[in-house]
Amino acid sequence: MNVTKKQAYIIGGIALVGLGVGAYFLFKKDSGEYDEKAAEKQANAPEVTVGKTGVKVKATPEYREELLKFAKSTELKETTRALLNNMNMSWIGRDKEQIKSLIYDRIATDDHMKILKAYFHCHKFSHGIYNKCWDLTYWLKHALGSDDWNAMTLKYPSLQIPLVCSCKK
């Protein structure tokens, strides 16, 4: 096989680029993979209040900005509106899978859940024998089955702490 010097350099360059691309994909961190430096930075972060929500979280400045953006987002308002629409349906018309997908798809972390709880606050619920003023915690506890509720509290531990509600009549 006759290969000129120019062709050898081209083949070598392509091989080198291929090795670089292969090494990148081999050694890159997967999204969601544990990052020790980021975890240490988050653990040493000061506790701050997120905007006007009154929610206190340990957050780095970047994470605090992300939480502030979420607290002001239309996604938070749309999620709350969808949950309230579902809350006002009768027990027969309620779709547990829709409730779970709303929360799991739109609420990334427990800190985001704290903001949703603060925004949702307390609402009057009156269907059948119930005529109660519930926060998000009590409503989800009654709307979901025990297995779904337990799974949700594992991902969002702040759901275990209900708000004290008193709706005016």
Task: Give the ranges of each region predicted by the language model.
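Long, charge-enriched amphipathic alpha-helical scaffolds and associated charged IDRs
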Residues: 27-169
